[in-house]
Every structure is written in structure tokens, then in C-alpha cells.
Amino acid sequence: MFSKKPHGDVKKSTQKVLDTKKDALTRLKHLRIVIENADSIDLKQFFDQHFSHIYYVFFENFVTIEASLKQKGHKSQREELDAILFIFEKILQLLPERIHQRWQFHSIGLILKKLLHTGNSLKIRREGVRLFLLWLQALQDNCSKEQLWMFSCLIPGFSAPQSEYGPRTLDNLINPPLNLQETQVTIEEVTPLVPPQSGDKGQEDLTSYFLEALLKYIVIQVKSLEWKNKENQERGFSFLFSHFKKFYLPYIFPNLCKENSLYHPVLDIPQVRPKPHYVMVKKDAETNETIYCTKEPFIQARVIVIRWLVSFWLEPKPHSGPNIPGMEGEVLPKNIQRAAASLVSREESKNDTVDKADKTAEPEQSHSNTSTLTEREPSSSSLCSIDEEHLTDIEIVRRVFSSKRSNVNFVTEIFRQAFLLPICEAAAMRKVVKVYQEWIQQEGKPLFMQEPEETVITSSDIPCSENVTDHDISIEDGEKREEENGTNISEHVRNSTWTKNGSYQEAFHVSEEATEQNIQAGTQAVLQVFIINSSNIFLLEPANEIKNLLDEHTDMCKRILNIYRYMVVQVSMDKKTWEQMLLVLLRVTESVLKMSSQAFLQFQGKKNMTLAGRLAGPLFQTLIVAWIKANLNVYISRELWDDLLSVLSSLTYWEELATEWSLTMETLTKVLARNLYSLDLSDLPLDKLSEQKQKKHKGKGVGHEFQKVSVDKSFSRGWSRDQPGQAPMRQRSATTTGSPGTEKARSIVRQKTVDIDDSQILPRSTRVRHFSQSEDTGNEVFGALHEEQPLPRSSSTSDILEPFTVERAKVNKEDTSPKLPPLNSETGGSSANVPDLMDEFIAERLRSGNASTMTRRGSSPGSLEIPKDLPDILNKQNQMRPVDDPGVPSEWTSPASAGSSDLMSSDSHSDSFSAFQCEGRKFDNFGFGTDIGIPSSADVDSGSGHHQSTEEQEVASLTTLHLDSETSSLNQQAFSAEVATVTGSESASPVHSALGSRSQTPSPSTLNIDHMEQKDLQLDEKLHHSVLQTPDDLEISEFPSECCSVMAGGTLTGWHADVATVMWRRMLGILGDVNAIMDPEIHAQVFDYLCELWQNLAKIRDNLGISADNLTSPSPPVLIPPLRILTPWLFKATMLTDKYKQGKLHAYKLICNTMKRRQDVSPNRDFLTHFYNIMHCGLLHIDQDIVNTIIKHCSPQFFSLGLPGATMLIMDFIIAAGRVASSAFLNAPRVEAQVLLGSLVCFPNLYCELPALHPSTPDIAVSQFTDVKELIIKTVLSSARDEPSGPARCVALCSLGIWICEELVHESHHPQIKEALNVICVSLKFTNKTVAHVACNMLHMLVHYAPRLQTYQPDSPLKIIQILIATITHLLPSTEASSYEMDKRLVVSLLLCLLDWIMALPLKTLLQSVHSTGAENEKTEKSVLNCIYKVLHGCVYGAQSFSHPKYFPISLSDLASVDYDPFMHLESLREPEPLHSPDSERSSKLQPVTEVKTQMQQGLISIAARTVITHLVNHLGHYPMSGGPAMLTSQVCENHDNHYSESTELSPELFDSPNIQFFVLNNTTLVSCIQIRSEESVPGGGLAAGLVSANSNVRIIVRDLSGKYSWDSAILYGPPIVSGLPEPTSFILSMSYQEKPEEPPTSNECLEDITVKDGLSLQLRRFRETVPTWSTIREEEDVLDELLQYLGTTSPECLQRTGISLNVPAPQPVCISEKQENDVINAILKQYTEEKEFVEKHFNDLNMKASEQDEPTPQKPQSAFYYCRLLLSILGMNSWDKRRSFHLLKKNEKLLRELRNLDSRQCRETHKIAVFYVAEGQEDKYSILTNIGGSQAYEDFVAGLGWEVNLTNHCGFMGGLQKNKSTGLTTPYFATSTVEVIFHVSTRMPSESDDSLTKKLRHLGNDEVHIVWSEHTRDYRRGIIPTEFGDVLIVIYPMKNHMFSIQIMKKPEVPFFGPLFDGAIVNGKVLPIMVRSTAINASRALKSLIPLYQNLYEERARYLQTIVQHHLEPTTFEDFAAQVFSPAPYHHFPADADH
């Protein structure tokens, strides 16, 4: 009817409205124009002045329209109705004062009745409701009863109010029933205006439809009435609301409790409510999910009221309308803003699948026949999102609610009712939770939450935090703002309209002070009421069978838990609130999780299908974390602790509890380490990161990336985003920049202002949004903290854990996404780098606990993963520790120690025989798990579960111990000893940590609950985190001693040494007696974790007292971790039934690990008694697994510790180790068993009679054993024969070797030495080459004991040589065919071993004959040496030569005897041998060298054999020569003594020398011949020994495979010339004539005579030592005879037949007959007769006489090479037949270079080995390197390693030491003909200056093998001496019984070597030789790892071959002869003339 046209003059229209002449329709039209165009003030004035005109115009037109509607009812009429109702609304709005005076009372009432008629369409009825409420608002108290009755009937579905006329319904009120008996005028019947149309959509639930409308219009029209007195607006709402409460609420909320008050809260914990009956209603069209309801009356109405009430507290952001990305700061048209808002809300609704209930408020347009109504109606698609245009209405409403206590109580009660709804109405509950969440987390609190004395914060610049999802604030702005106010980005600024809006605040100031005071209940009251009321959600019996409802229930519970967590971590709570929180958590945990065992078993494996299963992890985590956090902030009573103990100990059937407990203990241990021991478990001194990593750790301030990422992370997720490799670091906060001093001061101020609400003084820090758990559960849980992105500090005790949390997650998932967890910003913390441990704790716990997919630990004790990058916080040192009474560093003794009356410990060091007791119960043992996989809170369906759980656990675990008040440092408060006590000696004296005030660190704001998918709802992890954080209170506090922790009754909050200690011990025992856990798997899991916990304690102990700078050793720590605290639980666990086998195994493992450590405090007698009893029973146990566990974990150190009485178990261990060795299982601890046996082989000689427990009975019976040695050796021997494991077999062979040496040294002549030798010798040909190699090493070692072996059994050494020969003969054919280098290396080792044995025996022994059967079946005799050369010949030329009988050395069968069975059966190994690769192991790293390898392999044996031959030829019988053992080869060169050469080294001038020539002999040997001047006037005559000789000598220098040798030879002319005349020459004839010899006897007699004479001569002269000369010979002796005899004695190699002297006639040749012999004799006699006759006949003839001759004068040869030539001719080198093997060398520079190179090579194997001495207390390199001497035992040991050599004149291997005394004067040195070892002994080298120390460290550090003699009480650590080398450490620890324990540390790639092994225990008598042999073998093993490594002889052969190949000069004989005749043109030296 009224189309909108451009208006003319408003004044004109005004006049026309007032013009009574105009018709009503025209006046109406102009009225509309005035209304639409006039200002509101003018309009109000206009209406006030002309109300009657206006009403008339309206009423006339209304009547007209009503009539036309009844006639036609078309759409146009309906639109006219809309238009006229618009005027009606304006009348009601603009004239409230008149209406209040009942102006037009009946007329308006009638019109409204017509609109409200139940026959109207719903749209009109709803419009009627709206206008009726406007009218009622204006009337207020002036209305009549009828209006109130109508108000009570506006909503259909409620029972009608009663009156004197019966029930009042709306129909009755509109058309009252008439009493028609009297004839009266009746009023016209009211009829409907617009009946429903056919197309209108009906409403299923009219009650809800009208209730929503009523509630909505009550609010949105509050301000639409233009009252002159604005207070009437509020009164109008109050009027309507009070009648709503009166008429409707009793039906909607029948159980409304009016007693509940926020001001006097009822804090009784509610009862569990039974499960309602859920009925399926329908399926949701979009999601297809079933929707359920409970059919309770008015349930929907209840939900509507709740949602309506909620909407006033969840108001939208007023400041800018919706934030449209990219349009910041621009003014946008309203429609775009609306569109954006709807977009946002749509997005949100997507995320909140459960908000479907909102859809019950259907959009209204669809019900209307007209469009104009909807245009001017506010958008109301959701009751909760009221458009911003109406914010002022909401403020008024909120003001009413906040105006008096009854209204505040009403709000709280309705919210309580929300928590009582059935779970199918979870959407409404979520809204209420959201409201509470905002109240708790926002800065601007509602008035009733402010403290009574607190003033309202008005400054609008304090941003109020809002949930992150509500805003998309731009990151840059966020960063700026964060810098400015110290708040974090995720806290978006929003003007909280209800605390900061100007008009609202004015209103407050106007309102009376009294009221204001009255309604302020304070935050704590609201928190308490929330905690109690919200617990109803948990206490509703879940509908586990309906998955949708179960999901909803889980989601709701997690949301509540998240708020609890937020409160725990971020909100300041007083003692009462904390207690309330803990009580509620306890009861909730108990009621949700306690169930009968049958019920529990029923859901086994289907935990996810129950609420309890889903919530177990989160609940336990929240409970434990809250508990810890509470204890850090307030004093928690003993009763509450007892409650916790009884609840948790009754729920141990939940695996999640075990998991949470273990994670908690893990973090608590870190906190304990930090606070009590000043150690950071993630950055321990022993595993310091490399420098680079440390640099990385230094953060670079709060980086932008960090801020960006921290915007939107949930508690749980936020922690899961750790970026790889970076450790979170704390940053100084903006408020504490500046000097550390100021920071400290500030921190103290802060600590002292604990009670001031931090929110007033500190800017808020970040909050993190918390998302629900998604698939990435476990791994992501900890966010990406970069090392470079330090966490902002917060001052509360809560935020530090965040980093921890992060860390833990990392452990679980490497590919963490790159987002940062939000951290709390630093609100003024002191020492910024010291994070708060509580949070750390949580975080840390979080870190590990979170994923359902993740399993927690591996099953080995070593598998505990420690995050590498925990925050620095653990780094600070806390020095103040009490000293233990007796002065010994005391272990914290037991879980309850001496202070408590009923403990079992017998002294202050008692080992924990006490227990956690609860209500008089003692839990005698504490159990600790080892390494079973613990899935962390695995089945929690929302990820949050995990995270949080870990977090909390950490926290929680931090919270649990009681200190005994008398003995501990906790002041005033006596904690009950029942939970756990710590004796004075153990607990720290108050360490005053500066305490951070518990400031309210805002922490991640939990998720925007409405918009989270419930399935993914995660619990806030951060909780954990923060709980465990300490504020910056880790510094040693400057407070006076009376300030102590809250736990001790003081005021200091946060972590301190005493708090950490007590909390750790209480939490340790919080499960009660762990041996009472019924489920074997959980029992095992707990004990698995106990193993891990113990590992951490052990790690702490190992890291105490470690030198930080490696320059000084700190004093021993005063406080040490209680490593034996767990033993009572462990002891008890060993007594459990087999059902708990896994847990028992863990217990045994941990007992063994605990007791095989060095004990700081010696265990007392009671403890040892228990321990030995348990070990005795365990070792004899029928279950082999238990025996295996004990053997595995006691080996190798058990007997080396010297525990008092440990030898009582020797028999048990021998028997048990034997059982392990004989068991069939390969995975048994076989090596460990052999090590234990091997460590005992030296004991029997020490203890002749050993008292020990009898191994046949479990009773404790001590017997004396004398046969221990036999038992050990029997077991070791059988292992050496039959052990199926290779490494174990090797250890057994080493044990045999050690035992043989031990017996030989003690000269026990034990009969089994032969058997042991037999086993070792037979093992030489074992198929596994590693085992054979070890056997070979054992034989090699026995070389040093050859003399003792000979004494024991004279033929043993020779037998060993024969066995070696036979073994090589046996192996050679197969080895030559093999392609494996190992096989060849074995034969080479055997050859070298054979060489050492040969060199060790005298020649006489080697020449003894061997009887063997030859092929020609004749008995032949050959010496051992002969066999040696035969086998060597075979090795050089190939095994095929053995096929010739002449060359066959000896076979194994030839050696069979009583003592030696060469074919003894050895069991083969059963473990898979590592596959050989045909490539050389050494060269496998270099691929392209195959040819070299094959050549090397092929020649290996041949070259080794040739080396052995040349070595024997050169040294057998000669070594050591007069130069001593250090001199093996000649140092002489061609230029020495050579007067033709001036040079000091080989130089080209030698080639021009006429006196030298170079030759090659046999293509293998280089020979240099030099003619040099003879020596003159040398005492003793020099080379010629005083005989007449030439003036030149010949020097021959030979270079061959085994070295370089030189001989000087002189030509001898005769005896020295006697001065005086020479004797005249006499004639032979005259002599014989004068003598007249007798007639010779017959030939036979003559022969006999000779034989006799010869025999006599042999007897007389056999051992002649001087050369027979005329002067020494007796008359009857024959000179020639004597000389031959002398030669044979002194130079046996000249004998033609072994053992037969040269002067014994040769036997008669076989080929001559007796007749031929007689003929020869006769011919000789005839000749003799004829000559005799001739002489007699012509004697006197003149021609028979001659004159006397003079001796001719000798001529000096002219050639400088004459004598060389002569010698070569004598040796036959110039002959034709030698031409093929004797050649000249080309003389050139290259040859000299090659010779120099060859001469520089060692000719023996060389080793340099470092020796260190570590005195007691030395743990740093400086003190160790500056030792200048050691104990007597050490000096004796060093003396036994070798002999001292003077370095200034030592001519052997120097190992880099200097002759100039800079590296010392002397050092031990050892040499044989094949090996040289020099020891770099640290105590022998000077260390006066830094320079000498550096040099010393360089020499020692570069050695690959270190021998360390340690007298320190702690084990030596690799790394004390920092070096890249030191691949093998042999550490010797002297024991109390004069034995020595050996520890061998080697890098993993180093192969096995012996004879000593890790864990060996040996006697001092054999120690030096054993250690030396082991060091040499270790050095060889290391060399074997070098790719393409060659032994020195291989290298030497290669060099020789190169020289021969490249420098041999082929010549004709003539050229050769010429070169020999004259090597170079002769030039005469003047010096020769006078020579």
C-alpha cells in the first residue's frame, strides 16, 4: 500500500497527518513518511504531542484492513496488515509513558488479542507475541491480572494457570466463556485475522517455537521503548523476566535448587546419575547421524532457556564486525560485513557438528506470508548469535543478571542444570562450557567474578583474550602488539563490551557501592562452583552402547578436562579451590574408572567402546598433573595424599595408569636431577653435544617465525610441532631485559608478591588453542620448537614444560610439522634461561606420551630415548647439599628411611627395606618396570588424551613424596612417614631456590569448543607442561632460611630440592605396592619402567662429580641418587608366582644391574643377606629364563666389585653358567656365561678352600669347596669344545689360555693343562676361522711361557711346534683353493706363531728327530727343523709339493698320543656365520682394486713362508746378538767406512766408487760388495783376531725379505809375525828319516786304532771353546782332527750330517767290495815301500840338497775391488752355473731412492701403546697427565710390560719418542725377533710445562691402544683423554684381593681379540704379559680394519720385487766379468800410498 517514494517536506506530511479533513488512509500514508524520515528525537516529540491523532489514524486504518482481510485475505491485504502493524509498533515504542498510564488500555489489548488468536497463522501469532511483550514492557506493574494470565499462556504446551474461574487458557482469555443465562450485551467475539495458508510450513514443536520467540523478544526489544527515563528499559526487562521465572521456570526446570548460591556455595560432590533412556528420533539429513532424545518433559524447553542465557555471555566481537581477511582497517558496507559474518559462522558450524541443535531455531522467513516483517526483524537464525545492532540490549540484560545476588545465583543454577542434561543435549552443554571457559580465561571478568575489594579494570588498552578461532588477526599486527604489551598474538584484542564499554561502566559507577560490593563473589567461588557442577558430566552413567552418544560424552568430558587443565596450569587458585579440584578429580576418576574385574574383562580389547576406556589416559594425566601442580602452590594435606594413594592403588588394572605414572616419574626424575643434583638429563656432562650443536642451542631471541606459528595451536597439538633438531630455549622477557642483577632483584620482588593477582601487574602471555586429537596423535604432540626460537618466559610456575612436551613428542615422530607450540610470553621472569620445571615436567611427559599409535619403550634397558634438546633449565648447579652423617656420600637410603619408626632398615644407609605405607598398610616393595613397550594412553580417542596425559603425568609425578619432618629439611610440617620418608642423611638441606610467584600465566587458551570437531577434541597437553614448570625459581634463592617451600609449611611456591625430592618419592609409591597389581602385563610394564627409571638415576649418578673443563676433578658429590631404593619391590617381585614371569624377569634384571655397579655406600649386612638369598634361589631356579636373566645382567662385573661375601655365590654361578652353556637356545646369554666363568679361573689359586652356598639346595647352607678349579675348568673345557656360539667359544678359549698361564706361573702341574692345550691345538683347524684365530693367539701367548711349559712337561714345546707344522700341512691344500682371505690369514698367523715358537726354543731341541712313517715304508728319521723347512717349502711352492714323500713334513695322525688327540671332536657353531665375501675384508671399502687384492691374496701364504725361512736362516741360533734384542738388522750402509764416499747417506757418488758393486741374488736378495780398509790397532786384533791379514776387508751388505745384514770378511794369512829370525826350513825327508816311524799295522787294526783314537778325541775335546793351535795341542792329538771337531761344535750348520762330527770318518761306501778295498791298500803299501827305498839309497846325493829360501814379500794389489773379486770367485759367484741367479743392478738415482725407502722400513712388527695411571679421585685429563709416578703395584706392572730402555741411545723402534729427552729419559720396551712394542707411559714423560703436556697428550692420544691403570673408585671413561684415536681401551682396576679386574672398551667395528676379555679377572703374576699380549692383538685387530693394509713383510717383498723388476741389469758374461773386475774407473787416493 505504501510504496517508498522520495519524500517531500516532512513538515508538510506532518500537517497532513494532523489534518482531520483528510481521509484516514491519506493521513496514514503521510504518517508513514514522517516516521521513515524524521529524526528519532523529533519523532518522539511528534508522537508525544499528537498521540491522539496518531492513534486515531492507526485505529481507523486497522479496522479497515481487518474488514478487508476477512473479505478477501489476499497477499496485498496481508502486506497492508504488516504496514499498519509497523505503525502500531512505533506507537508502542514511542509512547511508553502514556501506555504505562493505561492509555488506550482496552483498545490495545483488543488488537493484541486479535493478533494472538490461536486461529491466526504462526507468523501473525509470533508478531502478536512480540507486540504484546512490548506493551507489557511499557505497562509493567500497571497491567491487570488478565495481561499476566495472557503472558503465562503465550507459550502453548504449559499447563494453564488456575484462577477462580478455572484454568486460564489463551483461548479463554481472548474470548472469555459467556454466562448466557442473563440477557446482557456481549462483546464481539475476537476472530483470527489471517488464518494459516495452505503453503505455510507448520511447526512440530510449538512450545519450543514460541518459547524461543518469547525469550528472544524479551531481550531484543529492551531498548526499543523510547523512555524518557532510561532506567525503565532495565525495569521493563526485569518485569518480564521475573514473570517468566514465575510462570514458566518451575515447569522447565522442575529440580531448580534455590539453595545453591555462588556466595555460599554447596561444594558437596554430586552422586553418580543413572543412564537415561535414550530414544532414536530421526537421522540427520546432512550427516546421516542418528539423533536421540530422552522424551523427558520440557527437555527441549530446558535446552532453549540454557542456550538463551548463554547467548548473553558469548556475545560477538563488537569492535569491527566480522574480520574479512585482507580488508583490515577498511570501512565495509554492512551487507558485505553480514555476508562475511555468515561465512564465518558457516565455517564454524562446519567445525561443530554437534551444534545441530541450533537448527531448531529455524529461519523465519519461511513462515511468513509477507516479506516486510522479516526485513525489519533482527536476524535470528541462531539464538546465540544476536546481531551486533543489538549489543546494547544484551548489555542491559547482562546488567540485570549482574545486578543482584539472586540473579547471579539464577545464572549459576541454570548453568548447573545444563550440566545435568542428558548427553543427547551435549550441544547446549558445550555452550555453557564455552562461557565458563571464557570467564576463566579472559582478563575482563564479569562483575560477580571480581574480588570483593577489587576495582574494575577499565583501561581499555589491556587486551582481553579471546579464543583464537574467533579471529583471524593479522600476524604482523599480532607481533607488534605482542611487543608492545607483552601479550601473545593469539590473544586477540577485543573490547569486552560488558566490562569495558563506556555506558556499561558508567552504569556501574552510578549503581550503589553496596550492591556492587554485594554481588562480587570472587574468582575462586566461581571456580569452585564450576569444578563441582561440571563434574556432573562425568558422573552421568555413559551410554556405551550408542556410539554417537559415547562420542558426545567423551567430547564433553574432554572439554571439561581441558578447562581443568587450563586452571591447573594458568589460573591462580587458593587452597580451597585446589583442594576442591583435587577432590573432584579423585572422585571423578574413581567413579568413571572403577569397575568390577568381570566388567573390566568384558571390555578388554574394546576399551575404545567405553567412556572409561576413552577417558582413562586423560583422567589419570589430569589428576596427576593437577596433584603435582597443587603441591607446588599450596599445602596439600596428608589425608588427600592418602586418598590419592588409595584411589590410584585400586585402579592399577588400567594400563593407562601405569603409562601415565611412568611418564610422570620420567619427568619427575628430570626435575629431581635439575633441582637436587643440578643436572640436565638431556644435556649431561658425559654426553655433551658437539660445539656446533651447542652453538645452535643459543637462541636468537623471540623470532618472527616463532610468533607466527604460535597463533593457533592447541594445547595438545601445539606441543606436537617440534621442529627437528632444535631445543626450546627460554628467552628473557621484555620486562626483564637488562642486567642479570636486576633480573634477580625483580625475581625476588615477584616471589614475594605471591598473593597479588598477577593479571594486574603483568601483561598476559600467549594462550594456545587446543585442537582435538586427530590421526597424528602421538607424534605430533609436541610442537616445533626451534633452538633458535626461544620460548617466551612466563613468570608462572607453569609454562616451562612446554618445551618438554615438545620434546617428548619428538621422540615419537621425526617428521614433525613445522609449527610452534604457543608458549607463554614472558611476563617478567628472572633468569630467563631457567625454565619452569613443572612445565618442563609436563611437557616432557607430554612429549613421550602422546600417541595412540605410539608404543613406548623398547624391551631393552638401553632403549630409553632421551630427548636431545630439553631446555637449558636443567643445567643449573645447586651446590648446597647436606653431608651424610658418617661422612660417606649417602645414597638416599630407602623409600622410607631411618626416620620412621616401623622401617626395616638397620642403619642410616639402609637399603630400602621400607615401604610406602598407606593407612597403616606397608607396601614392602616398590616395583619398577624395565623396558616393556607401554602404549601411552593409547586408546583415548581424542588426541588430546595423549598429550595431556603425558603432560600431566609429568606433572603429577612431580608431586608425590612426604618428607619425614624430623630428619628432613622440610621445616614446620611433618609429613607422614607412611607415604615415604627421607632421612636427614639423604635429603637435601633446604636449598633455597628463589621462588617464582605463582603468577597467572595464561596458557594456551583451550579450544574454541563450539567449533571443534568432537572426534578430534584433544585434551590440552600443555597442562602437563605447565604443571611441571617452575617459574624462574631455579636459582639458588637469596631468601633467608626461614622461607621454605609450601610443602614444608613455608610460602615459597614452585620447585625446590626438597619439593622435588618429596614429590619424586611420593609419586614413586603412588601406585601402592606394585607387586599387588593383578594384571601380569601391567605388572611387567611397571617393572619395565622401573628399569628405565633406574637407568636415569644411574645416569644421574654417573654424571655427578664430572669435571666440566677436564682440567680439575671435582670433589665427590655430597648427594647421590638412591640407586637401591627400588630393591624391596624387586625382592618381593622375585617371590611372585609364574603368572608374573615377565615382571619377575625385569625385577631380576634390575636387581643385577643395581648390584653390579660400584656401590657408593656399601650395602649393609641385612641387605646383602636378602640379596644373596634371592640370587641363590634365582641361580638354582628351574626356569631357565630366570637363570639366563641373572647371568646376562650380572656379567661381567659381578665378581670384580668385591661385594662382601660375593664369593659365596661362586658355585651357584659356575653351575648356572654351565646350564646356560649347555642349553640348546642360541639366544641364551652365552657370551655372558663364558665371561663369568672366565673371570673365575684365577680365583681357585687365591682361595684354596672356598666357603660357598651349596648349589644343589635352595637352602642357605655354606660348605667348604676344594674342587672349584676342577669344576670351572671342566665347564670351560666343555664350552671350548661344544659351545655353539662363536663369540662365546672365543671367550672360552681365552679363558683356557689365561688358566694355563695361571697354572704355569703357580707351578701347580695341574693334569688338565694337557687337555686344555689339546683343545686349543685342535681348535687351530676349526672351520670357523675367527675361533681358529683366537686359538692361534692363545698358542702365540704361550710362547712367553715356553720355559715354564718345558719344566711342566719337557716335550710340550716341541709337541706344539709339531702340531703347528701338522696343522699347516693339513690346512694348506684347502686354503690354497679357498677364495676367502680369512682362510689364508689363518695359515699366515699359524706360520708366524710357528716362527715365534721356533725362535723361543734352543737349537738342540729343534734338532731332535721326529719318527714318522714315510711313503716307502722304511723307517726314516728327520729332525723337527727338517720338518719345519719342508712345511715352509710347501707353503712357498704350493701344497702339491707335499705329494712327494721327500717333501712331506708330518701328518696330524703321526702326533696322536696319550696326551694329544689331534682328531678330538669339536661341535660346530650353530649361529649363522657372517657371509664371507670373496673380497678381502680389509679392502672391501675400496671397490676398484680387485686385481691388487687377488694378487695379495694369492701371495699371502707364500710371502709369509719365505719371510719365515729367511728369518730362520738369519736369526735362528743368533738372536739376540751382542747389540741386544733391540738390534735385529744392521744399521750399516754402503757409504759407511767407505773412503771413496764423503756423504753421510746413500748418494750418487757411490756409483763412481771403484770399491763397490751392487748385485741381485736369486731375484730375491740385494747384495752390495764393498772393499774397505782393515782396522788397525784394534784391541784383540779386530776382524782378523790378530792373525796376519790383508790390508783391506770385504763388506757384504745383504737386503732380503727379513731385513738387512752386513758381514765383514778378512783374508787370513797365518799367525802373527814373531820378531827375530825365521826358523830354518827342515826337509820332510830328513824329519821322517830321523823319526824312523814304526811299521804300520794292518789296515784293520789301523782303522780300529783311528776309531778308538777318534772316540777318545771326541770325549776329550767335544766342548773345546778355543781354536786348537800348536800351543794348545797335546802330542797325542791330531791338529786337523781337533780343528774339524771345533768347527762342528761351534758352527753346527757346517756339519755334513746332523749330529755327526766332521772328524768322524765317513761310513764305508756301499758300492766298494772287500777285494777292491784290499787292492787299494796293497797298492798304497807298495808305493810306500818303493819311496822309502829310494830315499835311503840317494839320501846323500848332491843333487838332493838345496839352499835355504826366504819368505817372499807380499805385493799390495792395485785394484780397489781386488778382495771382493777374490771372495766372489771363492764363493763361486763368477762361475757359469751361477750366471742365471747372480746379476748386476743398474746404478741410478732411482735405485738409491728405492734402497733408502727399503732401509727406512721396519723389519719387525711394531706397536706403540699408551699407558695411563689414574689415581683415586682423578677424573680429568690434567690431573691424569700430570701424574709423575704411581703406586707400587702400578710400577711393578709397568716393569713387567717390558724392560726399561734409555731413549737417548735406544736403537730399536722409538714409536715417535725423541732422543733429546723432551719425551722422557726411559720407557718400557719389549722385543722378540718378530715384534717390537714401545710403551708411551704417561708417568715417564715430562709434564712441567704446557708445551710438554701438549706433546705428551699428542704422543699418548695418537696411540690406538690405551692401557689405563685406574685406582679411582669410579670407572674410567673414554673421553677423559680427548683423542680421535684410542680405539681400544684396556682398563685395569686393582681389586682388594690382589687380583685385577679388566675392562675392555672398543669401538664396535673392532673384531674380537684376546687373551683378555671385558670382565676378565687375573692374578698380578700373569697380568703384565696378558695385558701386553692383549694390547698387541688389539693393535693387530685395528690394523686389520685398514683397507688394503699389508703386513711389513708383504710390503718389503713388494719393494724388493719392484727393485728387481726395474733395476736388474741383464748383461753378457763379458760385461758382467768386466764390471766385477772393475766396478768403476779407478782413481788413486793419496791415502792409499801409506796404507
UniProtKB/Swiss-Prot annotation:
Keywords annotated in UniProt: Coiled coil, Cytoplasm, GTPase activation, Nucleus, Phosphoprotein
Residues that bear Phosphoserine: S710, S720, S772, S796, S859, S860, S863, S985, S989, S993, S999, S1003, S1477
Residue spans of biased composition, Polar residues class: 366-384, 824-833, 849-862
Predominant cellular place of this UniProt entry's protein: cytoplasm
Gene3D superfamilies: Rap/Ran-GAP (3.40.50.11210)
Pfam family membership, one: RALGAPB_N
Residue span of region Minimal domain that binds to TCF3/E12: 1326-2034
PROSITE patterns hit by this protein: RAPGAP (PS50085)
Domain of life (superkingdom): Eukaryota
Compositional bias per record (Basic and acidic residues), positions renumbered to this chain: 345-365, 807-817
Domain Rap-GAP positions: 1795-2003
Quaternary structure and interacting proteins, as annotated: Component of the heterodimeric RalGAP1 complex with RALGAPB. Heterodimerization is required for activity. Interacts with the HLH region of TCF3/isoform E12.
Function statement: Catalytic subunit of the heterodimeric RalGAP1 complex which acts as a GTPase activator for the Ras-like small GTPases RALA and RALB.
Protein name as catalogued: Ral GTPase-activating protein subunit alpha-1
Organism field: Rattus norvegicus (Rat)
Gene responsible for this protein: Ralgapa1
